[in-house]
Amino acid sequence: MAEKKLTFEENLAQLEVIVNELETGDVPLEKAMTAFQEGVKLSQTLEETLSQAEKTMAKVMADNGEEVPLDAEEQQ
């Protein structure tokens, strides 16, 4: 059975749970390492999602069909 693709919000919530768990310091080392690895994967997934959203917004906001970076106003 195919694994359901989680939404950005679901991934973020999972990452927050992992961070809170690790911050307590009450986690055995092996579990902490596994949780840390999962947190890194989630972080990378979230970064990719945000990057893709930024690219999409840049295309939507472009004038004359040219892609404009979201920070174009800051550069001018």
Swiss-Prot record:
<comment type="similarity">
    <text>Belongs to the XseB family.</text>
</comment>
<keyword id="KW-0269">Exonuclease</keyword>
<dbReference type="GO" id="GO:0008855">
    <property type="term" value="F:exodeoxyribonuclease VII activity"/>
</dbReference>
<dbReference type="GO" id="GO:0009318">
    <property type="term" value="C:exodeoxyribonuclease VII complex"/>
</dbReference>
<dbReference type="GO" id="GO:0006308">
    <property type="term" value="P:DNA catabolic process"/>
</dbReference>
<comment type="function">
    <text>Bidirectionally degrades single-stranded DNA into large acid-insoluble oligonucleotides, which are then degraded further into small acid-soluble oligonucleotides.</text>
</comment>
<dbReference type="GO" id="GO:0005829">
    <property type="term" value="C:cytosol"/>
</dbReference>
<keyword id="KW-0963">Cytoplasm</keyword>
<protein>
    <recommendedName>
        <fullName>Exodeoxyribonuclease 7 small subunit</fullName>
        <ecNumber>3.1.11.6</ecNumber>
    </recommendedName>
</protein>
<keyword id="KW-0378">Hydrolase</keyword>
<dbReference type="InterPro" id="IPR037004">
    <property type="entry name" value="Exonuc_VII_ssu_sf"/>
</dbReference>
<comment type="subunit">
    <text>Heterooligomer composed of large and small subunits.</text>
</comment>
<dbReference type="Pfam" id="PF02609">
    <property type="entry name" value="Exonuc_VII_S"/>
</dbReference>
<keyword id="KW-0540">Nuclease</keyword>
<dbReference type="InterPro" id="IPR003761">
    <property type="entry name" value="Exonuc_VII_S"/>
</dbReference>
